Amino acid sequence: MGLREKLAELREEGLQDIKQSEDLKRINEIRVKMLGKKGPITSVLRGMRDLSAEERPKVGQFANKVRDELSAAIEEKRAELEQAAMNAKLAAQTIDVTLPGTPVAQGQPHVIQQIIDQVVDLFVSMGYEVAVGDEVEQEVYNFEKLNLPKDHPARDMQDTFYVTPSVLMRTQTSPMQARMLEKHDFSQGPLKMISPGKVYRRDTDDATHSHQFHQIEGMVVGKNITMADLKGTLEAVAQNLFGDKLKVRLRPSYFPFTEPSVEADITCFNCLGKGCAICKQTGWIEVLGAGMVHPNVLKMSGVDPEEYGGFAFGLGPDRFAMLKYGVDDIRNFYQNDVRFLNQFDQKG
């Protein structure tokens, strides 16, 4: 019997064995037996050295064809057996599709983020631009351009986290005032912006202080903008967060970046001005600082204070959340106690 006939016989034998295989173990045995280095096809091929130069390539091509056919048949049978095994496994498992599924807990925005979103949505509805700045800021934007000179106490190492002598973790979101003033085209109208974000100060953490907290800076600069515009804006914020009946009063204060500067108080939302423990019987609650943008701040950002003016304010979402929900310790917001945080579930 010639080599070609032997190969044909091995092919038929192999295909028959593959067809009759009933499990994966048997199909693997056939693969090793027929196609392995010690298998019959390899043994037949060793006899090719005795063939003539004319016959050798023909037999070689036929041998490769036989090997390919057997390999394809083995893989096809393997896939068939694997699918059959999977079907048998699934058939053996009883699944009651009427049983309720396992509930998956849904996340939600943190209570402070809820306050931020509420304030941002309000200002966006009033045409403000949201400007989000970097938490690592250049000292010049955090201080000089906001009219805080070199000898100002807020610039001491004991109050500020410095990264390098000229780079720091921003102590306020106010640097975005200067950055937005520098690039705004006033020929297109006034600048109306808010800048929410995290800020950092070297405070000792206690019930009312944290080394990291949140701030929302707001500013409007244009022509003919007055303190009355500021008061109306702050009343819109207070009423949006605490109720329509609240009023705002302004008291003189001092901030380096505004002149004149004011502290803004709102009617106590608990007693509506009658006096209670929350407002210490005054009927008012201090909520934020504000004022008219200092001419020096405008000048240092290339804006002519003789032509343009405006107001600025900075509110603390952390403090607003404490007031709104009666939380007496700011640390509760950051300790990740789910029992505490779930009280502010927006889904109810």
UniProtKB/Swiss-Prot annotation:
One GO CC term on file: cytoplasm
InterPro entries tied to this protein: aa-tRNA-synth_II, aa-tRNA-synth_II/BPL/LPL, Phe-tRNA-synth_IIc_asu, Phe-tRNA_ligase_II_N, Phe_tRNA_ligase_alpha1_bac, Phenylalanyl-tRNA_Synthase, tRNA-bd_arm
Pfam families: Phe_tRNA-synt_N, tRNA-synt_2d
Gene3D superfamilies, per the entry: Bira Bifunctional Protein, Domain 2
EC code: 6.1.1.20
Subcellular location: Cytoplasm
Entries under HAMAP family matching the protein: Phe_tRNA_synth_alpha1
Family affiliation: Belongs to the class-II aminoacyl-tRNA synthetase family. Phe-tRNA synthetase alpha subunit type 1 subfamily.
Protein name: Phenylalanine--tRNA ligase alpha subunit
Organism: Limosilactobacillus reuteri (strain DSM 20016)
